[in-house]
């Protein structure tokens, strides 16, 4: 069996590739390297350097593959209200292009990696039965891609599952991106002896997921023939913590005196965003094996090994009005 992973140089995609390879599957994948690191990619992966929006090339490459796991995304929810064209183009257009190519190439199953942004500002914990209610262009694009996938699969017979991973942390995560990955941003600053920035009062509530705890669930969504047409939250629902608490854990792991700088709230940021894991436990056997303290320590160890970096602002802002000062003034 052959499995193709989009965004295979990214955080999630590269770990999935390792998992499938360890199980004896042939793995191919592509990346445009906007967000991934080339050295994340296992040398056994058949790697293609191109953008998912190149539908014709994607279709030609996908011939012979049985499963596509679509991880590729500009996963920048907060940035999406300031660079909506860039973000939605690389979420919706890239996703639909890949779906179309997969159908053309007679791929049997498509696993779409969505986002908890699909739930918006509803009462937490979010369950899969909730209506989608995204509050920003990123979430809107993810939900539109989900709906398109279901529509296309209904017409053309391709199997589908949708994974909803949330707040994943661990080694290989992009840590020089100023717009996403809050714990890695804090660690990258603290390791350079710079204080963390916290948006608003810091009481935003999150459940952080360690990468290794999530991989087996996505593996089952890809490989288990008895699991079809399912949407599943992936990650823990126990022991949510505030951003203030997370910042203290990061500082401790970095051996840095914790003196955060509080700045204004980010527009459209959901205050209390946690997901129920009940369905993942029942259907996929999800289990939280790594607590948040250990997850942070492993993330910090990875950044230490790679070396902290200056932040990369190359994406820029399409709209600067009301954007966080940390982004406009490149303060990170």
Feature names for model-found ranges:
Residues 16, 218-222, 247-250, 296-303:
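Hydrophobic "lid"/C-terminal helical patch
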Residues 68, 214, 218, 234, ...:
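Non-catalytic, hydrophobic alpha-helical segments
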Residues 144, 148, 152, 182, ...:
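Hydrophobic alpha-helix immediately C-terminal to the catalytic Tyr-X-X-X-Lys motif of short-chain
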Residues 279-314:
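A contiguous, mid-protein "functional segment" used to position or interact
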